[in-house]
Amino acid sequence: MTTRNDVAQMIDHTLLKPEATTDDFKALIADAVRLGTYSVCVSPSALPVEVPENLHVATVVGFPSGAVKPEIKAAEAARTVADGAEEVDMVINIALAKEGKFDELEAEIKAVRDAVPAPGILKVILETAALTDDEIVAACKASENAGADFVKTSTGFHPAGGASVHAVEIMHATVGGRLGIKASGGIRTAKDALAMIEAGATRLGLSASAAILEELGE
């Protein structure tokens, strides 16, 4: 049985609203400590942030559209690592997946991977709601070939939607057991979170962490 604390240690407690202030990020960190989440995920401009030793720091690159050149994403990623990010969630150039240019997609991810050396963690946001099932599979394979640590469903900002159980199942069937799988975007209830975990998610990107963990109880 998945406990409340099990779920907490799968959560990237997230604040990526463009209008978020320094005080908002401080409150996010305080909440994460109180809730016992695995990490906080903050905007690159918020870095560096002060966190206790047992709380990890994640950020985003090429966010939210992914529509910038690979070298720009790599430079942004390198700067976030220099600013203390331990985990980087990059958004792919979705057009490359839609056009079937998976060699180019792999090269893009590899460029960011090189900017986030181990022990840094690289998560690749596929924006699965905008992709077909076959495109999700191919994008997962490109991510694995490029050396990513995780594949991730969504930014939470795309009009096509956020995470779905179906997408997580496809990702798990493709790279589960070799790469982590992060579900993010539109996960607002404990039922949602548990469904994603059941489908194969090993990490959750949540802004509703407090409400979900309260629902799960002790």
UniProtKB/Swiss-Prot annotation:
Quote a single Gene Ontology cellular component term. cytoplasm
Q: Cellular location of this protein? A: Cytoplasm
Instruction: Name the UniProt key words of this record, in alphabetical order.
Output: Cytoplasm, Lyase, Schiff base
What does the record give as the active site? Answer: D89, K152, K182
Gene Ontology MF terms in the entry? deoxyribose-phosphate aldolase activity
Q: What family does this chain come from, according to its entry?
A: Belongs to the DeoC/FbaB aldolase family. DeoC type 1 subfamily.
- Function noted in UniProt: Catalyzes a reversible aldol reaction between acetaldehyde and D-glyceraldehyde 3-phosphate to generate 2-deoxy-D-ribose 5-phosphate.
**What's the protein name?**
Deoxyribose-phosphate aldolase
The species this protein was found in: Corynebacterium diphtheriae (strain ATCC 700971 / NCTC 13129 / Biotype gravis)
Gene it is expressed from: deoC
